[in-house]
């Protein structure tokens, strides 16, 4: 995956409750990202990935977001989602590698070993929320680790990826052997540049590029609140 090294990956996602929810639209969004210089795409769902791959010749990080009533993990968190994604053949499959509760009480070790046994050649990315989770995923053998879920899990509540000059990223990089793909609320070009300087393999940026309703809200909130926008 040298194609994305030191470069930008754009996350093109729109969930069912969002105005741009459409595989066609995500395909065009990927074209726009490519024209802007993106070196890769992150996408959610088999349909979106297939459409994106028909429109751009860029490596894809594929996921399936699916909520289970009994679990907290939700990004490609069972073999069902992995099997579905293999139909679309993304270059990398990202899975929930947090310590959050999983379906049926399955452990991350068990899940990881199942994937490796069935699809030994598939590149895997660990979406994590803490330094400890990323270090653990690295030791398990994930090809890439990522701080994607910082602030989105019970164990990372209140944490922000940019705190103390990206301390979470710096602390993790000092302890891992596999490359890190930085992702999660990296919402300015300056932040993206900084994490590359710190030594990450690549950086993923999503909402600030591809979710116009959220971009608009930032402008509206700042106008109405005298320089501050609501998170």
Where is each model-derived feature located?
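Short, surface-exposed, polar/charged, turn-prone segments marking secondary-structure boundaries
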Residues: 36-40, 69-72, 88-91, 120-123, ...
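Active-site-adjacent beta->alpha loops and helix N-cap segments on the catalytic face
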Residues: 20-23, 42-61, 73-79, 97-115, ...
């Amino acid at each position: 995956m040298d194609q994305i090294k030191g470069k930008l990956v754009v996350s093109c996602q729109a969930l069912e409750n969002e105005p741009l929810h459409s595989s066609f639209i995500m395909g065009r969004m990927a074209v726009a990202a490519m024209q802007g210089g993106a070196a890769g795409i992150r996408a959610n769902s088999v349909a979106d990935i297939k459409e994106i791959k028909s429109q751009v010749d860029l490596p894809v990080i594929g996921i399936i977001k699916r909520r289970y009533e009994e679990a907290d993990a939700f990004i490609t968190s069972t073999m069902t989602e992995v099997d579905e994604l293999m139909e679309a053949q993304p270059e990398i499959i990202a899975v929930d590698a947090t310590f959050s509760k999983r379906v049926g009480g399955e452990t991350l070790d068990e899940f990881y070993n199942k994937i490796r046994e069935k699809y030994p050649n598939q590149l895997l990315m660990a979406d994590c929320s803490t330094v400890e989770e990323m270090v653990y995923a690295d030791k398990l053998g994930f090809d890439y680790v990522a701080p994607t879920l910082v602030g989105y899990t019970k164990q990372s509540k209140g944490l922000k990826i940019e705190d103390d000059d990206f301390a979470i990223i710096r602390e993790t990089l000092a302890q891992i052997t596999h490359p890190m793909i930085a992702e999660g609320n990296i919402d300015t070009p300056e932040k993206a540049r900084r994490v590359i300087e710190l030594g990450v393999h690549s950086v993923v940026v999503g909402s600030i590029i591809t979710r116009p309703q959220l971009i608009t809200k930032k402008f509206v909130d700042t106008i109405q609140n005298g320089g501050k926008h609501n998170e």
